[in-house]
Amino acid sequence: MVRRFKPAVKYRRGSRTHGWGRVGQHRKSGSSGGKGMVGFHKHKWSLVMKYGESGTGWPFYGKHGFKQPPTIAIEWRPINVGSLSDIIKELKKEGKIAEEGGKYVIRLLELGYNKLLGGGHIDVPVIVYTPAASRTAVEKIEKAGGEVRIIPLIHK
């Protein structure tokens, strides 16, 4: 398609400053009032009034929240119901799970997991000992004839 006007860059070729006045008037952070959060209590106060919560200046001023110490935070290592179903035979061969009353007994902490999620399908009845499980995971295991037993998570 034919253009009616030259693109702005081509139109400005040879003009040195492309319509921004003296050299340096469209450079660095001085042309925008400073870098980052600079000036929010001075010349950019109108932005605080427009975008901040009324009266508090949030999120421009003050400290917000806290950083949880890594020693307190729990690192969740989840496994889906479908993945568990896939590895049951391998775990039985390796002797990592037992069988009790026609159901496999699986202790997730011993396998390196601490949460059971509900992705996938399971058709084998199992008894799963885990510190945490999602609602859908519990429903799927109970539907297959098994049960989920919640155990306390000992966190160091």
UniProtKB/Swiss-Prot annotation:
Coiled-coil annotated residue ranges, if any: none
Region described as Disordered: spans on this chain: 14-35
Pfam families: Ribosomal_L27A (PF00828)
GO CC annotations, alphabetized: cytosolic large ribosomal subunit
4Fe-4S as UniProt keyword: no
UniProt keyword annotations, A-Z: Ribonucleoprotein, Ribosomal protein, RNA-binding, rRNA-binding
Highest taxon of source: Archaea
GO molecular function: rRNA binding; structural constituent of ribosome
InterPro entries xrefs: Rbsml_uL15_N (IPR027386), Ribosomal_uL15 (IPR030878), Ribosomal_uL15/eL18 (IPR021131), Ribosomal_uL15/eL18_sf (IPR036227), Ribosomal_uL15_CS (IPR001196)
Any one Gene Ontology BP term: translation
Residues spanning the membrane: none
Description of how the protein assembles with itself and partners: Part of the 50S ribosomal subunit.
Family, similarity comment: Belongs to the universal ribosomal protein uL15 family.
Function: Binds to the 23S rRNA.
Name by which UniProt lists this protein: Large ribosomal subunit protein uL15
Organism name: Pyrobaculum islandicum (strain DSM 4184 / JCM 9189 / GEO3)
Gene transcribed to yield this protein: rpl15
